[in-house]
């Protein structure tokens, strides 16, 4: 409610009563104008975590009142991306619910009803100013060093303006296009308590007479969101700090309509390492960008959760499941300062998840990728074997510490599935000597006759082979790695050879001996 102190500059203060007994309800309300921004994912996540921790409802509402910016299929993609991240809405345009419709374009009659109510109560008025007139007025105010605001040319006489009601009615009767503006009270202060930022106050002198209904019959964001937030019974509005300047308009609308506003929490901005606002010009900002690159939902959710939320003094944990985040999240631990978006931290988190993810979960991701590759390229290995769970589990356990994304179990480790087509040139120059071919040729029968082709047996046989020759194990280890994988790096050689199997290893040694030649001195 508003409280006035009776002075010449009234202090109209918005106060809130405790919402005793109300079920906590939060919402994520994106516009269907494209893909989901990582900042939007964080907003959705914090709304989800807060609602779930309080045994409440997390709702997705689509704010599509700006039809000119609407992108086909955007709303479905937004919701599917949230579900991919594990943020399943309790209510949405796709899931339904008791407070629908959840598309604002399907709620136009509702907005019209409340617009008429504001007009009748003297809190709103019709404005017939053209875009040219508005721009001319804006430029004039800028030249005068003033903050651009509507000049209230069409404010009726009985509301403190100079326009006769008869002139307004004449325009309406003639069907002249108009917008509906809210009448902001003069000389008032609008105050509210932000959960994150504490008390914030606005002077009405800085508030424009906001357009509520556009000439096309669609509401503006400000009007529709207030109406819907009330009718859908949201208890907490958690959104980005870019919406802070809109707060006085929203609170005034609540007052005009006689409604109790929800509680608000405005999240800090996401920043680039140079502390500029995160934007498309400086890198990937859509969640879909990161999905395409191979990041998992768990890592991205974990990452954005830490962008602004402080786990608490003395807490060094950085890897959280969605359930753990739900149990620990608190709006009171969200900071005010902007949060730095560092890709290195996301990469680190992705690796932590890969290290600990069950092999069967990884197989579900990489098997379709492998099958797709097998359709494009021929393999000399048995397709049934290399696509089997046992083989893939062995590859995963060997490569967990070495890959950054799940798909790299196939791309980075392709030698487990396909013959090397080339050999790392620098490695050959460094590790291939005039004696290498003869050593490999002599070692081949040892490999072929081993009773057990295991990592331990291969290691023992290799060391036993080089010892009488006065050679170090490296004389064979490096050439064997090159011919088997084509590269100079990888997991334990002996375990790699065991997984590949005797037949593949022998074949690759023979091929390498035939193909690799010493570089010209």
From Swiss-Prot:
Its EC number is 6.1.1.17. It is an enzyme of class 6 (ligase). It catalyses: tRNA(Glu) + L-glutamate + ATP = L-glutamyl-tRNA(Glu) + AMP + diphosphate. SUPFAM superfamilies: An anticodon-binding domain of class I aminoacyl-tRNA synthetases (SSF48163), Nucleotidylyl transferase (SSF52374). A motif ('HIGH' region) lies at residues 30-40. The keyword Glycosyltransferase does not apply. Keywords: Aminoacyl-tRNA synthetase, ATP-binding, Cytoplasm, Ligase, Nucleotide-binding, Protein biosynthesis. Gene3D superfamilies: 1.10.10.350, HUPs (3.40.50.620). One of its GO terms (molecular function) is glutamate-tRNA ligase activity. Its main location: cytoplasm. A motif ('KMSKS' region) lies at residues 277-281. It is found in: Cytoplasm. It comes from the Bacteria. One of its GO terms (biological process) is glutamyl-tRNA aminoacylation. The keyword Ligase applies. One of its GO terms (cellular component) is cytoplasm. ATP binds at residue 280. PANTHER family: GLUTAMATE--TRNA LIGASE (PTHR43311), GLUTAMATE--TRNA LIGASE, MITOCHONDRIAL-RELATED (PTHR43311:SF2). Catalyzes the attachment of glutamate to tRNA(Glu) in a two-step reaction: glutamate is first activated by ATP to form Glu-AMP and then transferred to the acceptor end of tRNA(Glu). Belongs to the class-I aminoacyl-tRNA synthetase family. Glutamate--tRNA ligase type 1 subfamily. NCBIfam families: gltX_bact. Monomer. This is Glutamate--tRNA ligase. It comes from Chlorobium phaeovibrioides (strain DSM 265 / 1930).
